[in-house]
């Protein structure tokens, strides 16, 4: 730790601005706030003397990761997951010094992960986590070099195949489910919620036939109206968590039995995709769907646009065959008098 509390109640700053092999600076203070201020002042002035070239930051990535974890990571909802992604990068790249994290190193990392069969989308998420870590360190004035990840081109991602349930399959699924698993399925089919978002709902999240999903993927709450029948079924006379007996592994097995050809990894999103697909088939607005699903970009929602009844219908009436199977007769009109 850069700052530790001593037995006499004081706080000691113990830092090496250029890394574990650099000059060691120690100072004791009566108040923790003074220790924190001194630490930031020392790091800033060591790295930011305008009349001198900035010294190379020789701190290892693992050391910077620990600083980030203590500062912010351990307080984030997905902190442990993000830490795991950063540690994978650290291991594959042999724990480089900060100045060694270059575009070349990142390209080598991406190539290694691809050779391991890791999808581009997963690799991009790894880089996003590392980028977020450096952003947090820079904002806290604990890192003064150039952001090593910013500007790095992400890998091109393949559009995932989306599977959805037909009306007949939905009927079979609901007939095969019971208890909280069935209630969650009905809620997801009614709102487009992710399984995890629904599973964490509490009774107080449903007011006047409106359900507010608090623990969302984007960390932004969203509210979706539901019918009175659905509200009564899932929340009537309940307190605390609405679905304490939900069993996702069991639900997944039932889903695979009903829809064996479901694309790999789509079981948890099949209900969400089914909602969005039928919403568009029934003439829903793509903008409204974006808001219901909580997508930050309309491009995410456009994958469902082709299910709309009127989608590109002009292709039928305006093509050369006019919707028929033979070319129409062409009459040439003479303009010679």
Curated annotation (Swiss-Prot):
Annotated catalytic residues: 194, 217, 269, 272, 295, 304 (o-(3'-phospho-dna)-tyrosine intermediate)
Tyr recombinase domain span: 160-317
Pfam family, any one: Phage_integrase
Keywords: DNA integration, DNA recombination, DNA-binding, Hydrolase, Transferase, Viral genome integration, Virus entry into host cell
Database matches in InterPro entries: CB, DNA_brk_join_enz, Integrase-like_cat_sf, Integrase_catalytic, Tyrosine_recombinase_XerCD
EC number: 2.7.7.-, 3.1.-.-
Highest taxon, organism lineage: Viruses
Residue ranges annotated for the Core-binding (CB) domain, each copy included: 59-138
Gene Ontology BP annotations: DNA integration; DNA recombination; establishment of integrated proviral latency; symbiont entry into host cell; viral genome integration into host DNA
Gene Ontology terms for molecular function: DNA binding; hydrolase activity; transferase activity
Protein role: Integrase is necessary for integration of the phage into the host genome by site-specific recombination.
Family: Belongs to the 'phage' integrase family.
Protein name stated in the entry: Integrase
Underlying gene: int
């Amino acid at each position: 730790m850069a700052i530790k509390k001593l037995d006499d109640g004081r706080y000691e700053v113990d830092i090496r601005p250029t890394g574990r092999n650099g000059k060691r600076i120690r100072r004791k203070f009566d108040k923790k706030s003074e220790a924190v201020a001194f630490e930031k002042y020392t790091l800033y002035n060591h790295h930011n003397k305008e009349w001198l070239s900035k010294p190379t930051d020789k701190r290892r990535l693992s050391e910077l990761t620990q600083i980030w974890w203590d500062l912010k990571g351990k307080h984030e909802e997905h902190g442990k997951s993000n830490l795991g992604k950063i540690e994978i990068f650290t291991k594959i790249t042999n724990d480089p010094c900060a100045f060694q994290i270059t575009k070349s190193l990142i390209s080598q990392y991406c190539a290694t992960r691809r050779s391991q069969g890791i999808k581009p989308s997963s690799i991009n998420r790894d880089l996003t986590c590392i980028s977020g870590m450096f952003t947090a360190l820079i904002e806290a004035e604990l890192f003064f070099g150039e952001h090593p990840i910013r500007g790095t081109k992400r890998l091109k991602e393949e559009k995932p195949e989306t599977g959805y349930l037909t009306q007949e399959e939905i009927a079979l699924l609901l007939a095969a489910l019971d208890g909280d698993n069935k209630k969650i399925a009905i809620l997801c089919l009614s709102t487009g919620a992710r399984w995890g978002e629904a599973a964490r709902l509490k009774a107080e999240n449903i007011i006047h036939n409106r359900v507010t999903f608090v623990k969302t993927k984007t960390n932004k709450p969203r509210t979706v109206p539901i019918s009175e029948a659905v509200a009564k079924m899932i929340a009537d006379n309940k307190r605390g968590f609405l679905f304490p007996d939900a069993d996702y592994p069991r639900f997944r097995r039932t889903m695979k039995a009903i829809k064996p050809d479901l694309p790999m990894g789509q079981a948890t999103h099949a209900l969400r995709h089914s909602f969005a697909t039928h919403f568009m088939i029934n003439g829903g607005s793509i903008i409204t769907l974006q808001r219901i699903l909580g997508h930050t970009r309309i491009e995410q929602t456009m994958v469902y646009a082709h299910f709309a009844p009127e989608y590109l219908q002009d292709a039928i009436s305006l093509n050369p065959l006019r919707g028929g199977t033979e070319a129409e007769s062409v009459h040439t009109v003479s303009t010679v008098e």
